[in-house]
Every structure is written in structure tokens, then in C-alpha cells.
Design a protein with these regions (language model features):
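C-terminal compact regulatory domains
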Residues: 1-2
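Long, amphipathic alpha-helical coiled-coil segments characteristic
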Residues: 12-62, 92-116
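Short, well-ordered alpha-helical segments
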Residues: 55-57, 67-87, 97
């Protein structure tokens, strides 16, 4: 199975992501690589540990937007919920959603890292 098939199996809407880029698979893969770098440098969980919710909102917004652009559906949906909860002053609930998505996110990120050509 190639990278895109593996991502599909994880719930990523690869076909929609490619459609957004007019079918340019090379560009899609390059942007997936950029997303990995962003996730590694923009981790939201430390902000929760330090009660830095303004910072968490900014990072979550960036992750949500990029995940949406790439149709990384599980990540996009979770960060949409996290943002909504943080913006309505529900950090405990947002942290619970983050805890659920982090293993899924890590699986997707690891898959991308391991399968980049």
C-alpha cells in the first residue's frame, strides 16, 4: 500500500485533498510534509498544560486550517471541535478532545514521515 492508500485507510479524504490541488499528487505530498513540520513545531498540548489558551487557540486554528486544506479529516474535525470549545471557555472539554485525537494524529503523521519518497 502506498502513502495515499494508507492515509485513506485512516480516514483521510485524499481524493478531496487532491481535487483541491487539481490532482497534483506531488504537490499534495509536499504539503503533507510541510504539515508534519508544522505539527512538530506547533504542538497544542503543552499550552493546555500551562493554561495558555490564547496560544492554544492560535495553534489549533493553524492546524485546523491546514488539515482542512489537505482533507486530513480526523485531524480537521477534532481541531474544529477543540477551537469551538476553547472559544466558549471550555478548556477541560477541549483538552479531552485533544487527548482523543493525539494518537490518531500521531498515527497519520508517522505514516506520512515513514512513507515520504
Amino acid at each position: 500500500m502506498n502513502l495515499l492508500d494508507k492515509l485513506r485507510a485512516m480516514g483521510v479524504d485524499v481524493d478531496d485533498g487532491l481535487k483541491r490541488l487539481m490532482g497534483n499528487e506531488k504537490l499534495y505530498k509536499r504539503l503533507l510534509g510541510s504539515f508534519v513540520k508544522m505539527i512538530r513545531t506547533q504542538a497544542v498540548d503543552p499550552d493546555f498544560d500551562e493554561n495558555e489558551y490564547t496560544e492554544a487557540i492560535e495553534k489549533a486554528h493553524s492546524i485546523k486550517g491546514t488539515a482542512g486544506d489537505l482533507s486530513l479529516t480526523p485531524i480537521y474535525e477534532a481541531y474544529t471541535e477543540i477551537l469551538n470549545l476553547l472559544r466558549t471557555d471550555k478548556p477541560a472539554e477541549a483538552k479531552a478532545v485533544l487527548a482523543k485525537v493525539l494518537p490518531v494524529q500521531e498515527e497519520i503523521i508517522s505514516c506520512i514521515e515513514e512513507n515520504m519518497e
